[in-house]
Amino acid sequence: LSKKQCGADGQFCFLPGLGLNCCSGLCLIVCVPT
């Protein structure tokens, strides 16, 4: 899984291969690669 960091809250998110960047594993907030 590609580990990235969310720009807003600074938490980590993962790219589960579904074309979505998920923050906190909730897949509700789009993360930006930092």
Curated annotation (Swiss-Prot):
<dbReference type="GO" id="GO:0017080">
    <property type="term" value="F:sodium channel regulator activity"/>
</dbReference>
<feature type="disulfide bond">
    <location>
        <begin position="13"/>
        <end position="27"/>
    </location>
</feature>
<feature type="disulfide bond">
    <location>
        <begin position="22"/>
        <end position="31"/>
    </location>
</feature>
<protein>
    <recommendedName>
        <fullName>Delta-conotoxin AtVIA</fullName>
    </recommendedName>
</protein>
<keyword id="KW-0873">Pyrrolidone carboxylic acid</keyword>
<keyword id="KW-0800">Toxin</keyword>
<dbReference type="GO" id="GO:0005576">
    <property type="term" value="C:extracellular region"/>
</dbReference>
<feature type="disulfide bond">
    <location>
        <begin position="6"/>
        <end position="23"/>
    </location>
</feature>
<comment type="function">
    <text>Probable toxin from a worm-hunter cone snail. Shows an excitatory activity on a majority of mouse lumbar dorsal root ganglion (DRG) neurons. Very probably inhibits the inactivation of voltage-gated sodium channels (Nav).</text>
</comment>
<keyword id="KW-0960">Knottin</keyword>
<dbReference type="GO" id="GO:0090729">
    <property type="term" value="F:toxin activity"/>
</dbReference>
<feature type="propeptide">
    <location>
        <begin position="1"/>
        <end position="4"/>
    </location>
</feature>
<keyword id="KW-0738">Voltage-gated sodium channel impairing toxin</keyword>
<keyword id="KW-1015">Disulfide bond</keyword>
<feature type="modified residue" description="Pyrrolidone carboxylic acid">
    <location>
        <position position="5"/>
    </location>
</feature>
<keyword id="KW-0964">Secreted</keyword>
<keyword id="KW-0165">Cleavage on pair of basic residues</keyword>
<keyword id="KW-0872">Ion channel impairing toxin</keyword>
<comment type="similarity">
    <text>Belongs to the conotoxin O1 superfamily.</text>
</comment>
<keyword id="KW-0528">Neurotoxin</keyword>
